[in-house]
A protein has these predicted regions:
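Ligand-binding pockets and gating/stacking loops
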Residues: 1-493
Length: 493
């Protein structure tokens, strides 16, 4: 039997060893056969993946999905800090009866210190509308609209920490670095208005939420699809040139830059990043006139300002949020595809957001007044103008709160096991309540749903299949809903 030459290195001997060669060859052929089998049975996600065709020179051009769309635009009202379901939408008479008693079965695992006893809802609930839906006295204006709403009472989250939970709600993942739902939507569908951003995030007058730009970031999608953040009182930074730069000089510089970019693009026609950069510069130039116009509310009638509460000098935070609500309506009116409207700011022991750990009733008296009338006026205004026919409105928060007070305090701890989202507008069946939490509002027990289900439903109403909308990143087929998510059919019209 011939032997291997002595001067072959050890790695070379391994490569020339016949047993090793045939063994690894057979293993590789088996892997190829398995791959073909999985493809033939549609068990590999890429087989069903759908990627939109995005023109490099017009990344925001309007596009259509694979399904028939019920909604054209989306408006998300996001209450940062975890607004309590027990003080808003989820009526629990048994919690009233058990007020002051220990938690049945012993205290649960909590986020911030030991748990105290069960605590009744801090507001009275009353039947509202023709449906008689029980809604808290904290929300009289929104409560009057319940016949137009669909309630999902059994949302669950993967985490009880604010930042990761905001990430999960907005991106489908608790980690940083994933695209927000608004970025996914605008990547897939573009926008109707080419003079305004396709995706706008409107921060609360008190500041930005804890997960910050993750809520409107593009993640690994092209950066052109990230949200643009501005409000009625704080327009886009650096929108205009410095005072020292004349209009003529600014126009000349812009023209020169455009000429150089276009010359470079002609030499490199396949450079999609350069094409996207040119498109972004052109949009920025158009925004110099369109954004000041859209944020100037002087053309709004006194009746409209009063309806929203935007003319109330006694409460500048509420008036500021009301003006943001008017801005949101104006953006939807102009065809902006996706609008995020934030109510509440960074973690502040509940003083600037809905994180009511210590003094829930005292703080919610403030937050409820800020949020209720302006948000209800926004929904009414959209409906009166016929905009709800093709606009989906979603009210949500990152998780719920516990049915007991924290020990030694008058507030509730974090609870990701059952909380409420409210939907209205395009494609939504009005007047329905989906799912139930247990008798004290501690956890979802019937028709349990997840944030993935909510996001899958939003995509479905826009004509997008959450199981197929896919972007390959680092060799992985990524989706907003990962490998999860079901459409919430019972709330759809």
């Amino acid at each position: 039997m011939p032997t291997l030459p002595n001067n072959i290195t050890h790695p070379g001997r391994l490569l020339l060893d016949r047993r090793r060669f045939f063994g690894e060859t057979v293993s590789s052929l088996g892997s190829i056969a398995l791959l073909q089998l999985l493809h033939s049975q549609n068990l590999i996600a890429d087989e069903q993946a759908w990627t939109p065709q995005v023109p490099p020179t017009a990344p925001h051009a309007p596009r259509t999905g694979l399904l028939q769309a019920k909604a054209r635009n989306v408006l998300v009202v996001f209450c940062a800090g975890a607004c309590s379901q027990l003080e808003t939408w989820d009526y629990k008479p048994e919690l009233i009866r058990l007020d002051g008693q220990p938690m049945p079965g012993g205290p649960p695992v909590t986020f911030q210190g030991p748990a105290g006893n069960l605590a009744r809802p801090q507001y009275r609930f009353r039947p509202r509308g023709q449906s008689g839906k029980m809604v808290s006295d904290m929300l009289p204006h929104l409560g009057a609209l319940v016949d137009d709403f669909a309630f999902v009472h059994t949302l669950t989250s993967k985490t009880n920490t604010h930042g990761p939970a905001e990430n999960f709600l907005s991106t489908g993942f608790v980690q940083d670095g994933f695209p927000s739902i608004g970025a996914w939507v605008t990547w897939a569908l573009g926008t109707e208005n080419q003079n305004l951003p396709a995706f706008v995030a409107i921060p609360d007058p008190r500041g930005i939420p804890q997960a910050s730009v993750n809520n409107w970031g593009a993640g690994f999608l092209p950066a052109v699809f990230q949200g643009t953040s501005f409000s009625a009182s704080q327009p886009i930074r650096n929108l205009h040139p410095p005072i020292s730069t004349s209009a003529a000089a600014d126009n000349s510089a812009r023209s020169l830059l455009q000429m150089l970019n276009e010359q470079q693009l002609r030499q490199n026609p396949l450079d999609s990043e350069l094409a996207a950069r040119i498109a972004s510069y052109e949009l920025a130039a158009r925004m110099q006139t369109s954004v000041p116009r859209i944020t100037d509310l002087s053309s709004e009638s006194s009746h409209t300002l009063s309806m929203y509460g935007a003319d109330d000098p006694s409460d500048p935070i509420r008036a500021g949020y009301a003006r943001n609500c008017i801005l949101a309506r104006r953006l939807i009116e102009q065809g902006v595809r996706f609008v995020q409207l934030f109510n509440g700011a960074y973690a502040s022991a509940g003083k600037l957001n809905w994180d009511g750990h210590q003094a829930l009733r005292e703080q919610y008296d403030v937050h409820g007044r800020i949020m209720d009338q302006p948000t209800a006026a926004l929904i009414r205004d959209l409906k009166q103008r016929g905009l709800l026919e093709d606009t989906l409105v979603v009210w949500c928060t990152e998780f719920g709160r516990m049915p007991m007070f924290q020990k030694g305090a008058f507030g509730r701890d974090h609870n990701p096991q059952g909380f409420t989202a409210v939907l209205t507008g395009a494609g939504i069946r009005p007047g329905v309540s989906y799912g139930q939490t247990d008798e004290i509002g501690f956890k979802a027990v019937q028709d349990v749903s997840s944030v993935h289900d909510l996001n899958a439903t939003i995509l479905h109403l826009l004509g997008l299949d959450h199981t197929r909308l896919t972007f390959r990143h680092n060799g992985v087929a990524r989706r907003l809903t990962d490998v999860h998510g079901h459409i919430l059919q019972p709330i759809l019209a």
